[in-house]
A protein has these predicted regions:
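Short, Lys/Arg-enriched N-terminal segments with co-localized hydrophobic residues
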Residues: 1-5
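Short non-domain terminal segments
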Residues: 8-9, 28-29, 70-71, 76, ...
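Compositionally biased, low-structure terminal segments
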Residues: 11, 47-51, 74, 79, ...
Length: 245
């Protein structure tokens, strides 16, 4: 072959090689979040099912590596779904006309749990709501602060009350904004039963009064046993549960 033909063939191989590389990368990565984390389509769907679509943009490198290194992407996300009076086999969800609560688990050597409380329409009262968990027969590990998503913003909530087997986070609902979504997550050993509850304040209540409760599986949502002086402030929404055994 003459020199010019050799150059053309060499150039063609470079172009084809570059195109192949681009196609491989395009297939490998489906989404890039705000933190620069690259997810393939399976990982994106996994996080959407386990958390929500809003949460995906806030996944950090540490969170991603934790799921990857523990083999969670190869496991099935499981829950039981409660809708009205019907028990469904899709997620641990209790749903009303205005809001829902869902609890999901994925297990390897230990389990990861996510709890999602979501408003389906705008809340009229914006005061101190509560999202909590009660663990029967186990202990928590690696608890993350609850995140409140509203109209594209994300705020971590650090006002918590905790015991060895229970946790509650106080959520001050924003005065403005729709599409409210609250997510709490943590790790736990593969034993026991987890109860979760989201309690909405039906009328304005102070932060101090919102903390007047003890933890009990016999309380509201199997988590909150309110002091009589504040019991009427909360809506007594039914909770959800998941067996870890």
């Amino acid at each position: 072959l003459k020199g010019d033909n050799m150059k053309k063939i060499f150039y063609l191989l470079i172009v084809l090689g570059g195109t192949l590389t681009l196609n491989v990368n395009a297939e490998e990565y489906f989404y890039k979040n705000k933190n620069g984390i690259l997810l393939n389509e399976n990982e994106y769907k996994f996080f959407k099912d386990f958390y929500t679509e809003n949460y995906i943009d806030y996944i950090t490198e540490d969170i991603y590596n934790d799921f990857l290194n523990n083999g969670f992407f190869d496991k099935k996300v499981f829950s039981t779904e409660y809708n009205g009076s019907n028990l469904l086999t899709r997620g641990a969800v209790h749903e009303t006309n205005s809001k829902l609560i869902r609890m999901s688990k994925v297990c390897s050597s230990h389990c990861k749990i996510s709890i999602v409380a979501k408003w389906k329409k705008s809340s009229v009262v914006r005061s101190y709501d509560l999202i909590g968990i009660y663990l029967e027969g186990g202990n928590f590990e690696n608890i993350s602060y609850a995140k409140l998503f509203s109209d594209g913003t994300c705020v971590e909530n650090t006002e918590t009350k905790k015991t060895d087997n229970a946790l509650s986070t106080t959520i001050k609902l924003p005065t403005k904004g729709n599409s409210l979504e609250i997510i709490q997550s943590f790790d736990v050993k593969k034993s026991g039963i987890i109860y979760s509850s989201y309690q909405h304040a039906k009328k304005s209540i102070s932060l101090a009064n919102s903390r007047k409760f003890s933890f009990s599986k016999y309380g509201y949502g199997n988590v909150y046993l309110f002091d009589e002086s504040v019991r009427s402030y909360y809506d007594a929404m039914q909770g959800v549960s998941i067996n870890l055994n």
